[in-house]
Amino acid sequence: MRNRYIQSFQEAQIGKKQVPQFKAGDTLRLGIKIQEGDKTRIQHFEGVCISIRGNGVDRTFTTRKMGANNIGVEKTFPLYSESLDSIEVLRIGRVRRAKLYYLRSRRGKAARIKELRK
């Protein structure tokens, strides 16, 4: 049982931000606010969502992309973070798992995810 003040605050935080519906296996493009000195810019990070955990305001998700020289880069974000400017779903993946941690050991074509056909 949560405190009603905390619950009302969390509901207000959730209501402020429009977040698209996505799940593990979807390819996302994230707009991340980067503070450099007194300037703020938006850096895009494009990768596959490999896990979603938690609920409500505490919900986080992890994205993975292959960087330069086939080095995997994973970033975990709170879903309702102020540093996330935008979340865009580029592709909907067809997977049978909620956590795609097995992609960490795959390289190249083996790490591909099939696209969901409608």
From Swiss-Prot:
Any one biological process term the GO annotation gives? translation
Looking up Pfam families in the UniProt record yields: Ribosomal_L19 (PF01245)
InterPro entries in alphabetical order: Ribosomal_bL19 (IPR001857), Ribosomal_bL19_CS (IPR018257), Ribosomal_bL19_sf (IPR038657), Translation_prot_SH3-like_sf (IPR008991)
Asked whether the keyword Hydrolase is assigned, the reply is: no
Claim: Ribosomal protein is one of the keywords in the record: yes
Which UniProt key words apply to this protein? Ribonucleoprotein, Ribosomal protein
Q: Which Gene3D superfamilies match?
A: 2.30.30.790
List GO terms (cellular component aspect): cytosolic large ribosomal subunit
S-S bonds: none
Give the highest taxon in the source lineage: Bacteria
Q: Name one GO molecular function term.
A: structural constituent of ribosome
Family, similarity comment: Belongs to the bacterial ribosomal protein bL19 family.
HAMAP family tied to this protein = Ribosomal_bL19 (MF_00402)
What is the role of the protein in this entry? This protein is located at the 30S-50S ribosomal subunit interface and may play a role in the structure and function of the aminoacyl-tRNA binding site.
Name this protein carries in UniProt: Large ribosomal subunit protein bL19
